[in-house]
C-alpha cells in the first residue's frame, strides 16, 4: 500500500518513454499491491524512492560487471591512489580525495579492489546516492569515508526491519547456519534484490534465490542437515531522510495517481507504519 500524505493511492508512470519506465512501473505495482505500508509526505519523496531503487539495481549490476573481486578482510585490497587499506581490511579514504571520485573508481577499476559482501552492499548504496546528488553535496556528506563491513558513514541513513514485503532495490540476507568453519566467509550472503526473482550478491553474482541457497549449501560442514535460507531481514536506504539532499537538477519521475482513500491516519512507531 502506498500513502502520500493522508491519501492512499495507486500510482502509475505517466511517461512510458522515460528511462527505466517499465522497471519503475513494476516497483510501483509491487509496492501498491503489498500489505506493507509505504508512506511518503509528498509525491517528490516517492519519485526519489523510485529513482533510488533503480539506481541501486543498476549500481549492483555495474559492480558485478566491474571486475570487483571477492576477498576476506584478511585478503582485501584497494587502489592505493584513492584508498588506504586499514589493519582490519577496510578501505580508508586518503586525505584530500573527493569521496565521489573514489567511489566512482571502484566501478571503473574494479579489478583493483577486493573485499567481502557487506562492504560491497554499502558501496552500492553510496554509488546509487551519488547518481542522485550533486558531487559537492555527496562529498560534504560523506567526507572521510571508511568502507568496512557495516561501519558506514553516520550521514547514510538506513532502515533495517524484520518482516515486510520484498521490493526491487531492497537489501536482504541469506543465512548459512551450518557453514564449514574453514570457509566462514560463506556463513551468509548479503544481496540486492534486482526484481524478477533475481538477486545480486558479491561473491555469488546474479542468481535466483534457489541458486544462492545451493551455492551456500555447497559450503556447509560435512553431513549438514540444515539448509541455507533467505531471512526476513530487509535493509533499505531511508529515502525520506536522504531525499532532502537530492539534486534539484535530477529529473523527477512522472507519476499519476488513482485515489483510493483521502482520509487515512498514518502512525509510525520505529520502522512499522500503520494506517487507520
UniProtKB/Swiss-Prot annotation:
Its UniProt entry gives the catalysed reaction(s) as:
L-glutaminyl-[protein] + L-lysyl-[protein] = [protein]-L-lysyl-N(6)-5-L-glutamyl-[protein] + NH4(+)
Give a yes or no for keyword Acyltransferase in this entry.
Answer: yes
Q: Which UniProt keywords apply?
A: Acyltransferase, Sporulation, Transferase
List GO molecular-function terms, semicolon-separated: protein-glutamine gamma-glutamyltransferase activity
Q: What biological-process terms (Gene Ontology) are attached?
A: sporulation resulting in formation of a cellular spore
Enzyme Commission number: 2.3.2.13
Task: Give the domain of life.
Answer: Bacteria
Q: Name one Pfam family in it.
A: TGL
Keyword Signal in record: no
The UniProt family comment states: Belongs to the bacillus TGase family.
What the protein does comes down to: Probably plays a role in the assembly of the spore coat proteins by catalyzing epsilon-(gamma-glutamyl)lysine cross-links.
Stated name of the protein: Protein-glutamine gamma-glutamyltransferase
